[in-house]
Amino acid sequence: MKNDLFLRVLRGEKVERTPVWIMRQAGRYLAEYRKLRAKVPHFLDVCRNPELACELALQPLQRFPLDAAILFSDILTIPDAMGLGLSFVAGEGPQFAKPLRSSAAIESLTLPPSGSLDYVFAAVSATKRALNDRVPLIGFAGSPWTLAAYMIEGGASKDFAFAKSFAFSQPQAMDVLLTQLTCAITDYLRGQIKAGAQAVMIFDSWGGVLPYWAYEQFSLPYLKKIVAAVHTVAPVIVFTKGGGLWLAAQKTIGAAALGVDWTVSLAAARKIVGESIVLQGNLDPTFLMTDPKTIRQAVAKTLADYGNGHRYIFNLGHGITPNASPDNVAAMIEAVHELSPQYHQ
């Protein structure tokens, strides 16, 4: 492989500089992405077309010297395959036609039918071929709690109050759903790895809305089961948005790396998780709306916060926003390339 910095860090090897990639690096901030999406306005039509998904995954690599590519898809492909009727409404985000609003609905749910997610695996294979060993390819899935939250809530939410109240009042039914999703996600990630993904990431996007005890009940144990089943075939990154206070618990998941958002000090996180776990993050995406000088200063602070060592991957603390400037993205990557080698002596 021409550039294996990302994988070398996950394996615990020494590297000459800090690798960098961006969550949602294929997205609306790129004019070429908007141009393609104008031709194919329905988001799921793009995800279900391996050639288009491959093209979008490669777009940021054609523009920026990133150290990894990530599959172009969505975390809600699994519940869609389970028959909940996923659609994306402009300005409102994802919606399910058949949300799970009772224990009976959960009991009647079945795993995704065989072949229903083959389009995702085909997109992985197509992207891997097109990369031609330029950089590693990351596969991904949502966490059991995050998928369950969407499936019960029926769509996007600021606080997922309905999903939380269901979990609190019907924990046994919630366990049935989370256990089923754990099986589906495990198979899904292993399928992506078989198709060519060299690392996988689990997005626990809404773990941070839970109280600490509820995180330990409704998210943590299921993440552990998935990682235990997957980490032997590829390194796993786990990212719980808003979960920085729970790093002591997260270090028990068994993941090769933990993502952190911008509310967390990398130095403090490093002390908590120890030297055997990679940290990934955590620049506030808002910096990409500023200017190159400000961004360079922020990158310098972020790198210094982690300090010397080889167990760190530079990223944002959440997905890149549509109003980010591509020129500022280039400035951020350049700053990482120029400023990080001093920490790898």
From Swiss-Prot:
The protein's predominant localisation is cytoplasm
- InterPro entries found in the cross-reference section: UROD/MetE-like_sf, Uroporphyrinogen_deCO2ase_HemE, Uroporphyrinogen_deCOase
The record's disulfide annotation reads none
Give the record's pathway.
Porphyrin-containing compound metabolism; protoporphyrin-IX biosynthesis; coproporphyrinogen-III from 5-aminolevulinate: step 4/4
GO biological process per UniProt: protoporphyrinogen IX biosynthetic process from glutamate
**Keyword Mitochondrion on entry:** no
Q: Tell me if Transcription is a UniProt keyword of this record.
A: no
Q: What is its EC number?
A: 4.1.1.37
CDD domains xref list: URO-D
Q: Name one GO molecular function term.
A: uroporphyrinogen decarboxylase activity
Task: Name the top EC class.
Answer: lyase
Give the binding site residues for substrate: R24, Q25, A26, G27, R28, D74, Y150, S205, H318
Where does it localize? Cytoplasm
Reported function = Catalyzes the decarboxylation of four acetate groups of uroporphyrinogen-III to yield coproporphyrinogen-III.
Query: Into which family does the record put it?
Result: Belongs to the uroporphyrinogen decarboxylase family.
- PANTHER family annotated for this entry? METHYLTETRAHYDROFOLATE:HOMOCYSTEINE METHYLTRANSFERASE RELATED, UROPORPHYRINOGEN DECARBOXYLASE
Please identify the protein, giving its name as recorded.
Answer: Uroporphyrinogen decarboxylase
